[in-house]
């Protein structure tokens, strides 16, 4: 699937315009996008990064990394996904960067999601749903998620987000109402961010292939 990821990432470069500040996500597919972005780094003003991992890779390519508080809203955000449904709703957060990813998506006029074909699903939920949680609320949130969804929350032991929080991965879900579930989980005290991108889905999904498919 690495070739499909590369093809999707390189197609996303078509959406990058001269003088842009580009929002950049996290993950294996985005790594290919960062590499491609580095080749045209002289054409853009810089990037806003969703993780320390992506920040390091951008800087390796000589791309200036900027603070979202100073840039204001962005024209373009490019990121991957763990799952994508036909309505371009996503599960994200496998790399534990979901909160910063959601912030940048919200701040961006256009959100381009780049995936390989294995990430396309008819209904979200086969991939465990990540939920970022304040550490002291981990058990409370897990109990409430179990009661609300019937899914099985599992603590991602040993993982601390860039924000200093923990992650619960909720298994055995079939998410037929992504917007409703995102809203409900966000109401649980202690939840920082839910890895459902449904209220703000992707605007365009690029599926890697020969040629890439644009949805």
UniProtKB/Swiss-Prot annotation:
InterPro entries: NagB/RpiA_transferase-like, Ribose5P_isomerase_typA_subgr, Ribose5P_isomerase_type_A. The active site is at 101 (proton acceptor). Its EC number is 5.3.1.6. Keywords: Isomerase. Substrate binds at residues 26-29, 79-82, 92-95, 119. One of its GO terms (biological process) is D-ribose metabolic process. PANTHER family: RIBOSE-5-PHOSPHATE ISOMERASE (PTHR11934:SF0). Belongs to the ribose 5-phosphate isomerase family. Catalyzes the reversible conversion of ribose-5-phosphate to ribulose 5-phosphate. This is Ribose-5-phosphate isomerase A. It comes from Xanthomonas euvesicatoria pv. vesicatoria (strain 85-10). The gene is rpiA.
């Amino acid at each position: 699937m690495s070739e499909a990821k590369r093809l999707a990432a390189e197609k996303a470069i078509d959406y990058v315009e001269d003088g842009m500040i580009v929002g950049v996500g996290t993950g294996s597919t985005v790594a290919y996008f960062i590499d491609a972005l580095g080749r045209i780094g002289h054409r853009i003003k810089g990037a806003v990064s969703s993780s320390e991992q992506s920040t390091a890779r951008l800087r390796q390519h000589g791309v200036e990394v900027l603070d979202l508080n100073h840039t204001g809203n962005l024209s373009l955000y490019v990121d991957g996904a763990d799952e994508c449904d036909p309505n371009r709703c996503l599960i994200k957060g496998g790399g534990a960067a979901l909160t910063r990813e959601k912030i940048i998506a919200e701040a961006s006029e256009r959100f381009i999601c780049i995936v390989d074909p294995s990430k396309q699903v008819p209904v979200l939920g086969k991939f465990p749903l990540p939920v970022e949680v304040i550490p002291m609320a981990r058990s409370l949130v897990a109990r409430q998620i179990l009661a609300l969804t019937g899914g099985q929350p599992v603590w991602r032991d040993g993982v601390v987000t860039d924000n200093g929080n923990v992650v619960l991965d909720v298994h055995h879900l079939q998410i037929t109402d992504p917007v409703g579930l995102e809203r409900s989980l966000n109401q649980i005290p202690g939840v920082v961010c839910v890895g459902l991108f449904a209220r703000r889905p992707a605007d365009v999904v690029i599926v890697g292939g020969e040629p890439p498919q644009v949805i």
